[in-house]
Design a protein with these regions (language model features):
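A short N-terminal helical cap/helix-turn-helix that marks the beginning
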Residues: 1-14, 31-54, 215
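AMP-dependent adenylate-forming
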Residues: 17, 39-70, 178-186, 217-218
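Generic, well-ordered alpha-helical scaffold segments in large soluble proteins
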Residues: 43, 74, 78-81, 85, ...
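Conserved pre-ATP/AMP-binding loop-to-beta segment of ANL
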Residues: 49-51, 174-177, 186-219
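Alpha-helix termination/capping residues and helix-transition junctions
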Residues: 87, 135, 168, 211-214
Length: 219
């Protein structure tokens, strides 16, 4: 009960623990909250200009810093793009990206709108990604153009293409965040979408939070 007071609840829980069906237990039953709101929104008034995220990339030799207010903006921009792609509460999204700021934005954006995200390690080959796509059966796959390993550029898009060809339940759309690492990046019309282009179309939108019952999955 003491821990529950550290969380913002849109609707307070009616019961702290329901253990009527062991070994399955439900915590904070009836409470409605949102992980993105607790990670970002609740800090805007008191910590808006405080650093919330620092991403130091050995791949691009850059460091990017975001205050809570800047993080809020980036997450809402990403959430607005997801909504444009008709991703909503309960939909599943697979994220196949390296350690980059946009991976964080994508996870928080999914949580914000109530979509369930699954992060797949970007070191996995196409076959392994295909297996996870079949398990999750996502509405959308989010990826990057490329990453770097030991100084070598690793293009992700060919791996994604191979995975989608092998999967039994591939997503209908692929959202690609390009950092300009792969000069040969090729998008398949009708399936692949460029994040930056979509974000410019959508513009800056404050996306409402989808409040979830405490035991609903966010990831």
């Amino acid at each position: 009960e003491a821990q529950s007071r550290l969380i913002h609840w849109e609707t307070p829980p009616q019961q702290i623990l329901d253990d009527a069906n062991p070994p399955f237990r439900r915590w904070f039953v009836g409470g409605r909250t949102n992980l993105c709101y607790n990670a970002v929104d609740r800090h805007l008034d008191s910590r808006g200009e405080q650093l919330a995220l620092v991403v130091a990339s050995s791949e691009t030799a850059t460091t990017r810093q975001f205050t809570y207010r800047q993080l809020y903006r980036q997450v809402n921009d990403f959430a607005a793009v997801l909504r444009r792609l008709d991703v909503s509460h309960g939909d599943r999204v697979v994220i196949y990206m390296p350690n980059m700021a946009e991976a964080v934005f994508a996870m928080l954006a999914c949580a914000r709108i109530g979509a369930v995200h699954s992060v797949v390690f970007c070191g996995f080959a196409a076959h392994n990604l295909a297996l996870r796509l079949d398990d999750a059966q996502p509405k959308l796959l989010i990826t990057a153009d490329a990453g770097m390993r030991s100084g070598k550029v690793i293009a992700y898009k060919p791996l994604v293409d191979a995975a989608l060809a092998a999967a039994q339940a591939p997503p209908a759309q692929v959202l690609v965040v390009s950092r300009g690492l792969d000069p040969d990046l090729s998008l398949q019309p009708g399936r692949d979408l460029d994040y930056a282009s979509l974000q410019r179309e959508v513009g800056q939108v404050d996306v409402p939070v989808q409040w979830l019952e405490s035991n609903e999955p966010s990831y």
